[in-house]
UniProtKB/Swiss-Prot annotation:
Name of protein: DNA-directed RNA polymerase II subunit RPB9
PROSITE patterns, sorted: RNA_POL_M_15KD (PS01030), ZF_TFIIS_1 (PS00466), ZF_TFIIS_2 (PS51133)
Organism: Bos taurus
Localization terms from the record: Nucleus, Nucleolus
Primary location group: nucleus
């Protein structure tokens, strides 16, 4: 919550009743078609400054993304190497890419995917 009582866009915080300090819950005013926050213990309600009541941010780890993108080994834009053979099938060629992870320890980690059609093994070094 900002000092002026408003909320940062995209941030959905817990709001509390100004009269009895209980939690406020989202409620629709069907007649005026607006979102309200209402107390379930007293009659206090306030108009919502934002129509968003829930934010679900999904972040994927690089390991998950290589599983989701099955064709990563066929991507012509990814660099290829023969210096890191597949540990699973022995195939010499692999595509590689750098992690875009927000974690500092993963900042320079390279991920490899075997280009053999029957394999698709993923690893990092």
């Amino acid at each position: 919550m900002e000092p002026d009582g408003t909320y940062e866009p995209g941030i959905v915080g817990i709001r509390f009743c100004q009269e009895c300090n209980n939690m406020l819950y989202p409620k629709e005013d069907k007649e005026n078609r607006i979102l309200l926050y209402a107390c379930r213990n007293c009659d206090y309600q306030q108009e919502a400054d934002n129509s968003c009541i829930y934010v679900n941010k999904i972040t994927h780890e690089v390991d998950e993304l290589t599983q989701i993108i099955a064709d990563v080994s066929q991507d012509p834009t990814l660099p290829r190497t023969e210096d890191h053979p597949c540990q699973k099938c022995g195939h010499k060629e692999a595509v590689f890419f750098q992690s875009h992870s927000a974690r500092a320890e993963d900042a320079m980690r390279l991920y490899y995917v075997c280009t053999a059609p029957h394999c698709g093994h993923r690893w990092t070094e």
